[in-house]
Amino acid sequence: MLECYMGWNLEYAKRMLPKLERFEPRWLEEPVLADDIDGYAELNQLTSIPISGGEHEFTHYGFRQLLEKRAISVIQYDTNRVGGITAARKINALAESFSIPVIPHAGQMHNYHLTMSTLASPMSEFFPVHDVEIGNELFYYLFKGDPEPVNGFIDLDDDVPGLGLTLNHDHFDQFNITE
């Protein structure tokens, strides 16, 4: 996987793609700005590298437009941005109807459940937990229960309720909590 995080313009991406093809990356993530759907479509037709996007898309209507224009080969929605698990499941169903794989943006327990609940998802992203001062890692300070991969695979525990997370009281003293 190669991450561009919308850092390229269309012309630069068109120059880079032929140079990257020999490395056979699994996908190229967000090469151009998220709103440049025509640019995504042009790049997706230009290369053998699957183009992924959707991290900055917010509705299943937007994903339908991306799919109808054949703008992406891999959907990578952000569950928190699209409206949660229910909205993400609608996008998964849409992706299945277009035979497009879904690899939700970021790890975290809700995405693991979404990945395991649809044929459209061949894998989940996984980020090892390590201490940082700021960022999306706040999730890991607040909750316990994220699975540890074994030989590259994650198993979800069927014997725990809900998503399988519990509050991590060990770190609460680091936050201002109001009731």
Tell what function each PLM region has.
Residues 32:
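Phosphate/pyrophosphate-binding betaalpha-module
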